[in-house]
């Protein structure tokens, strides 16, 4: 992880609980382009490293703060972690379940860190572009939970406008046999995603060595195939 994330970085350890450490950080921020922190707002205030503390010393400073749950609200000062704030609280942990009876799945270590970093990067670069136009720095932020919700935004925004969802089904009871995943003879897994089913169905049948299915009246149309999904 260090080799991937920290190329060309230099490190400096500061004890920000002491005035001497804070003074060094303030001197660095006074000549920096971007200051990045993942401390919650309350901790920043205690250490004297909020935007209001640092910006007066450097009007061109881009102050970028990243948190678990955002800059404001009841949860602003809660510590956040990839597996809880990004994965669980956003609803992603539930959305990947096959059905309501399936045990929720854990996320891969750091699963949300990279997409969150890209969103954060976008905020910082936008602020730098703004500074090129105005000469002024600014405060930008992002958080784990917001990025998790964004990852699930197709469903989240649908729910916000009153959409109704079909009950989720396990792969063994799928509504559509040609949009599903299967274990092959060599124990590897294959996932099918026929986005234009009417056009792609004959090709799939040929690839499977089952051209007879193309003319089988039970599976002649998309409606027929869905009605007999388990049989297919």
Across the structure, where does each feature detected by a protein language model lie?
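Generic alpha-helical structural signal
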Residues: 6, 26, 122-125, 202, ...
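A structured beta-alpha segment of the ubiquitous adenosine-cofactor-binding alpha/beta core
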Residues: 1-56
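Aromatic-enriched alpha-helical interface/lid elements that frame and gate functional surfaces
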Residues: 178-232
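Short glycine/proline-rich turn/loop motifs
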Residues: 8-13, 101-106, 232
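Structural signal for conserved beta-strand scaffold positions within catalytic alpha/beta enzyme cores
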Residues: 4-6, 13, 65, 94, ...
């Amino acid at each position: 992880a260090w080799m991937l994330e920290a190329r060309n970085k230099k490190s400096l350890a500061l004890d920000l609980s002491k005035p001497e450490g804070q003074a060094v950080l303030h001197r660095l921020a006074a000549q920096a382009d971007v200051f990045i922190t993942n401390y919650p707002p309350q901790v920043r205030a205690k250490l004297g490293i909020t935007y209001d503390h640092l910006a007066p010393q450097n009007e061109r400073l881009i102050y970028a703060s990243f948190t678990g749950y955002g800059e404001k609200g009841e949860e602003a000062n809660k510590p956040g972690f990839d597996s809880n704030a990004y994965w669980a609280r956003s609803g992603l942990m539930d959305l990947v379940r096959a059905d309501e009876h399936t045990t929720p799945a854990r996320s891969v270590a750091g699963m949300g860190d990279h997409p969150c970093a890209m969103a954060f990067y976008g905020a910082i670069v936008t602020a730098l572009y703004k500074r090129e136009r105005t000469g002024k720095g600014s405060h930008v932020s992002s958080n784990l939970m917001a990025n998790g919700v964004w990852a699930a935004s197709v469903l989240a925004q649908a729910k916000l406008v009153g959409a109704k969802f079909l009950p989720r089904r396990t792969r063994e009871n799928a509504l559509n046999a040609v949009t599903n995943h299967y274990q092959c003879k060599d124990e590897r897994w294959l996932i099918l995603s026929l986005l234009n089913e009417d056009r792609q169905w004959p090709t799939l049948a040929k690839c499977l060595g089952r051209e007879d299915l193309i003319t089988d009246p039970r599976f002649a149309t998309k409606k027929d195939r869905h009605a007999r999904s388990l049989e297919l």
